[in-house]
Amino acid sequence: MTNQESQSVKVVFVTRDETLQPEAPLPPVMVPTSLKRLGLSEIVNQLLDTETPVPLDFLIVKATAGDGGASILDEESASSSSVLLRPGASLESFLADNGLSSEVSLSIEYIRSVLPPSFLASFSNPDWVAAVDINARWTGDLKPVIASGSYDGVVRLWDHSGHVTGQLVGHNSAAKAVRWISNDQLVSGGSDRLLYLWNPDGKKYRRKEPGQVGKKELNYDSEEDSDEEMLDELPAASTVTPMAALHGHTAPINDLAVHAKTGKIISASADGSVGLWSTDYNDMPAIEPHTAAAGGLTSTSAQKRRKLANSGSGATGLGAARQRGPLAVMGGHSAAVSAVAFHHSDPTVAYSVSLDHTIKTWDLATAEAVQSNAGSPDPSVDTRSTSFSLLSLCTLPQGLIACGSSARHITLHDPRVTAQVATQAKLVGHTNFVSSLSRGPESNPFLLASGSHDGTVRIWDVRTTKSLHVIHRETLTENNAVFGVDWKQNLGIVSGGQDNKIQINNNPQSA
């Protein structure tokens, strides 16, 4: 045995997983520095006296010299100080990589191993997929579970087998955002500056019988079938007229967020503003219908697909919808607003990110930006500035805000601390714009999924700065940027993008 193999280091094992909490704090132990993940997992399972061994991963939280032990993990601590012990790496290699000796004391957080997500299915769409959203209330029946917004202006509803069960025709340019409000209500936003409220009839969610709509009809890449033939085979009843058209923005809508319990919608627009709306059109002021919307479809094929989706349904788009104005339009950004999100637990608070490099906090009760030093003689807007354009946003249960950037990384911000502290952590791995973010299921509040123009979706544990897993597109094309990603426990990870595909990967569940 060499001298290196015989070295040991003092370790304290801690966890935030309530299902893995010991009855009393685990005592410090001396472990060989040659141990890797499996060896550490065996030790922790022995200390916990588990009936069945639990596969574990390890986050090295802190390394301090000469303190006689490691500090207890702080529930409110930022996520940037942890380093994931990668597969194949040992404590010895971690110490060497960080310039540490075995005389330090290590605090190591143990977490359940997250299994890599596997590919489940891929559905063809006629045009680029700008946005996807999973119906969180779906329970495995034949109703639609995925809503997608497409660059041909059509919002499509899909069941879990890839059948198009509804086509929502209203936008005259790219449908860039779509969100479920309830089992039978959705909202969409487009490059035509409009939001649409939809209430598809439940009768339209039936599975088509064999020979009506199947895989052949969904294969829009097939050379033997034209778009017209495939879309004509969808019954007219599966095309839906918008319930209301919402006006207020003067430039394309980039993102939407919904808080169903309070019936509120917020929108991000390229006009630099955040719109506030209701899920009930009766709560919003009636306005005169606009005679035209900007940004109409320029592609002949896209116009044809939209016309076919609309044919025979009796829908007349904007003219058939009730015209409503916003509850409020909140200005303040100096460039396009790229994404919006509600606070994770307070529906009166919202956040927005922009190409102007900033994050703003909004008080929806007053429809104004939150003041960072309200009550003082010189209050200022709570604005957090970064050095790069921000493209995507989601809120996390710990109170953190995750922002995807044009600089290819994800930054974590804590709105509870002063705005002068811009970044709490930086998650690095993507090689192009981070265009979409979605937090993981409630069962693990630290998981996050990101979609990028590099053609991948990455899975993160925000307690460490490196991704856990990378999902590649099954479509082997050169142009495969991911524009939208959503992650729900009832289905898995759904992504869509430049390859005209909606891809489903299963939940990378904890072992």
UniProtKB/Swiss-Prot annotation:
Highest taxon listed in the record's lineage: Eukaryota
Keyword check for Nucleus: yes
GO terms (BP aspect): maturation of 5.8S rRNA from tricistronic rRNA transcript (SSU-rRNA, 5.8S rRNA, LSU-rRNA); maturation of LSU-rRNA from tricistronic rRNA transcript (SSU-rRNA, 5.8S rRNA, LSU-rRNA); ribosomal large subunit biogenesis
Gene3D superfamilies: YVTN repeat-like/Quinoprotein amine dehydrogenase
MF annotations from Gene Ontology: ribonucleoprotein complex binding
Key words, A-Z: Nucleus, Repeat, Ribosome biogenesis, rRNA processing, WD repeat
Annotated stretches, region: Ubiquitin-like (UBL) domain: 9-112
HAMAP family assigned to the protein according to its UniProt record, in alphabetical order: WDR12
Name by which UniProt lists this protein: Ribosome biogenesis protein YTM1
Species of provenance: Yarrowia lipolytica (strain CLIB 122 / E 150)
Taxonomic classification: Eukaryota, Fungi, Dikarya, Ascomycota, Saccharomycotina
Encoding gene (name): YTM1
